[in-house]
From Swiss-Prot:
Belongs to the methyltransferase superfamily. tRNA (adenine-N(6)-)-methyltransferase family. This is tRNA1(Val) (adenine(37)-N6)-methyltransferase. Its main location: cytoplasm. It catalyses: adenosine(37) in tRNA1(Val) + S-adenosyl-L-methionine = N(6)-methyladenosine(37) in tRNA1(Val) + S-adenosyl-L-homocysteine + H(+). GO terms for cellular component: cytoplasm. Gene3D superfamilies: Vaccinia Virus protein VP39 (3.40.50.150). It comes from Salmonella paratyphi B (strain ATCC BAA-1250 / SPB7). The gene is yfiC. The keyword tRNA processing applies.
Length: 245
């Protein structure tokens, strides 16, 4: 079943347990976010931080995957996107667990008195260059407002000693991000290289870093099989969310 088959309403994306409206968000629901939300390790997680929540997709996916006593803080700089995320949360099964903060993570993070077991982000990754159609889309796509070194430093200040910081990035940018993280004292613990099919090279990488050293587990995920249907591994990862799986 194709991903587009789940988009039953034109202004958003329908999942099995919730709906994500995204017509007022610069970055729409896409495969990158769905992969990250389904992949991030959640065992024994007690508190979650979503940096740059956008429509609230990752916060909602993680709410579905975790116990009902796990609070989730979702921070979004763009006021329009944050309002839409708040509406998506309010209409979901977990309005009591997810708090959307309309704020700059660089201002919000230093004020926090608790640390997070899981920090997740689908971060911007383009260097400033060609102008986007709107300032909101430029903010979502380019690193000018939140470069990767700053993001890594903020996550380091907010994470528990044995927590995980998870991101999804294009393959080459992910390699550079990994080296930057290692230089800053992070340890790479999980890596999944994502390819569209067996014949193609990976185009995305899912990364999980921790302040704590340990073995790094690496694997490869192929989205589609030779018949162009979703692969067994992709189906197993995402079937709790996609409506027609």
């Amino acid at each position: 079943m194709s991903q587009s088959g789940s988009a039953l309403r034109r202004n958003g994306f329908t999942f099995k347990q919730f709906f994500v409206a995204h017509d007022r968000c610069a970055m729409k629901v896409g495969t990158d976010g769905i992969l990250l939300g389904a992949w991030a390790p959640v065992a024994d997680v007690k508190r979650i931080l979503d940096i740059g929540t956008g429509s609230g997709l990752l916060a909602l996916m993680l709410a579905q995957r975790t116990d009902d006593n796990v609070p989730i803080d979702a921070v979004e700089l763009d006021a329009g996107a944050a309002m839409q995320a708040q509406e998506n949360v309010a209409h979901s099964p977990w309005p009591h667990r997810i708090t959307v903060h309309t704020d700059d993570i660089q201002r919000w993070a230093p004020r926090q008195t608790v640390r997070f077991d899981l920090i997740i982000s689908n971060p911007p990754y383009y260097e400033p260059g060609v102008e986007c159609a709107t300032p909101q889309r430029e903010q979502a796509r380019y690193t000018a407002t939140l470069d990767h070194q700053t993001l890594l430093a903020i996550a380091a200040d907010c994470i528990t000693e044995d927590g995980f910081f998870c991101v999804v990035l294009p393959e080459q940018i992910g390699n550079a991000f990994t080296q930057q993280a290692l230089n800053m004292g992070w340890h790479l613990r999980l890596r999944t290289d994502v390819a569209e099919n067996e014949a193609r090279l990976p185009h995305r990488v899912l990364l999980a870093f921790s302040p704590q050293a340990g073995e790094c587990f690496s694997d490869r995920l192929v989205i589609r099989g030779s018949d162009q249907h979703y692969s067994e591994s992709y189906t197993a990862l995402t079937q709790a969310f996609y409506l027609f799986m």
